[in-house]
Amino acid sequence: MGRPASIKKCPDCHQPGLKRNGTRNGKIRWRCTNCGSSPSRTRPDTTQLAQFTAFLAWIKGKESQGEVDGTRTGRTARRQFSWCWNVPIPKPPVTGEIFDEVFLDGNYLPHHWCILLARSSTGPVTTWQWCNTETAAAYQAVLARMAPPVVVAIDGSGGCQKALKETWPDVTVQRCLVHVHRNNLRDLTSKPRTGAGKALLALSQTLLKVTNLDEAALWSANLAAFYSEYDTWLKARTYARENPEEALRRGKKPSGWWYTHERDRRVYYRFDRLFTNGQLFAFLTAIPGTILERTTNPVEAINAQITRLIGLHPGLSEDHMIAAVEWLLYSYTENPSTPAEILKNWRNNGEPTRRLIPKHKKQPTPQGPQKWGTAPTPEEGLWARKGCEQLATTGQT
């Protein structure tokens, strides 16, 4: 028994009696039981929604394009995703909400790009900014889109500190204690040999375990005790006349000098400077009765997802890498729109094309670039011999 005829009318004979059939490519086809015509109907909006949803899932997933479309080459997926790269990525709204803590960090990516991230203490990514390196101007662009929080956690970048000093001078800064410990390990190594080095390493390791004000007070007392014991050690000097070879390597004059234990000094004065500025234990004192995050791990988790994306989808062009990273970041914003809502807004706005980041090309100098010359150069092994020069001077042949 065949399928019953529906009450839908045929577009050709205008009589009811259409039967639904399918096609190999998935399109819906109808067959009229009266005139025998086979009209078909497509839903571009439904097709686009399915492709766009698969596109976003591919960006956040670990499957290759060949695994997405079931082929070895992935050409079908690339063809279906080709228009998705042009959809503009929505920007996170500027809400003006004042957070207890904001985490700032930069992540260096391929194609000579760096992306600066800001994540709030409640979890969502608040904003991001593309740049070439972590400059103060780039961080100021990030800070301009947010209200000053109570505490901002940073890893110690010079550009970030300068931007905070100029833009948010009254905001309390919390230095990431993990980054402080890593800087100390770079100076001390993991197995210092001197007594001062071992004591500083113990202070650095204990710093990571401080969880309350009493432990912070004990740590600061131990730091003061270290200085009392190793004050003379830290001030020891080596004069150039005592070690001429090292002085030559350092570029010191014969009357010059340098600190003998400069790495130990660097670690101690790093502790002293950060403690004096209140950047070591701000997570305990900024909000009474509340313990905040003491590291930049929340924003480092987002950076890890970006690194994972680039590793799972190698070979992305510069433009596609930027788009993929921004789609990933948008998924971590507060209340991101669904794929259907994104496409609906995109169509209502006239389907605009995603704006590409312009490339800053180096301008030529007023004299212009150096042109190729024809003079012989020693680098090429081409120069006149002395005998030839003498013959040319005397006119002999």
Residues covered by each model-derived region:
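Acidic/histidine-rich catalytic cores and adjacent linkers
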Residues: 29, 34-44, 51, 161, ...
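Short cysteine-rich clusters marking metal-coordination/redox-active sites
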Residues: 10-13, 32
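Conserved beta-strand -> loop -> alpha-helix junction used to position metal-binding or nucleic-acid-contacting
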Residues: 154-206
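Short, amphipathic alpha-helical "recognition" segments used to contact nucleic acids or chromatin
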Residues: 46-63
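Short Cys/His-rich "knuckle" micro-motifs
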Residues: 18-24, 42-45
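RNase H-like nuclease fold core
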Residues: 2, 24-27, 31, 38-41, ...
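DNA-recognition alpha helix
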Residues: 63-71
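A broadly conserved sequence feature marking short terminus-proximal activation segments
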Residues: 1-8
